């Protein structure tokens, strides 16, 4: 039997859905302008909510203005916080980005130390830098990191 790539992809997709298997652990980094509004808010989050995303998202790290979607009361942030709690998903904002936007308690000198604390953000969000991200994800390391 000859199997083309499309048939193989469809078969793989069917088997993953049918068996309920999650084959890859993913961490997302939201760096590009509007990534949390567009890719997260309109694609990733709805798929996580209806369990059609097909991968196990173990963490999300937010830079620059992408952290704004995580402000308390923001509909995207509130929905994401609910999913993160259910799925035990890490939500971390860049500590320096949060300090600059008054969404963290701490100083620039404390950035990267683990001493900066998120404030005014949805439940479950922590502030940190790469050392804190690596430490938090280390015991459950992702198979892939996707930067958007």
Give residue spans per PLM region.
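A generic structural motif
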Residues: 53-58, 89
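Mid-chain, well-packed structural core segment of small domains
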Residues: 79-123
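A short aromatic-anchored loop/beta-hairpin motif
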Residues: 122-137
């Amino acid at each position: 039997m000859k199997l083309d790539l499309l048939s193989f992809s469809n078969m793989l997709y069917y088997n993953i859905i049918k068996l309920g298997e999650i084959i890859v652990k993913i961490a997302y980094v939201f760096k590009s302008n509007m990534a949390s509004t567009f890719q997260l808010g309109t694609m990733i989050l709805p798929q996580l909510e209806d369990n059609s995303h097909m991968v196990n998202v173990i963490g999300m790290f937010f830079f620059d203005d992408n952290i704004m979607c995580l402000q308390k009361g923001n509909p995207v942030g509130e929905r994401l916080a609910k999913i993160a709690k259910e799925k035990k998903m890490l939500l971390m904002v860049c500590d320096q980005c949060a300090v600059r936007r008054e969404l963290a308690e701490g100083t620039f000198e404390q950035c990267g130390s683990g001493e900066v604390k998120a404030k005014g953000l949805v439940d479950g969000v922590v502030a940190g830098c790469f050392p804190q991200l690596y430490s938090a994800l280390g015991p459950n390391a992702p198979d892939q990191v996707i930067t958007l």
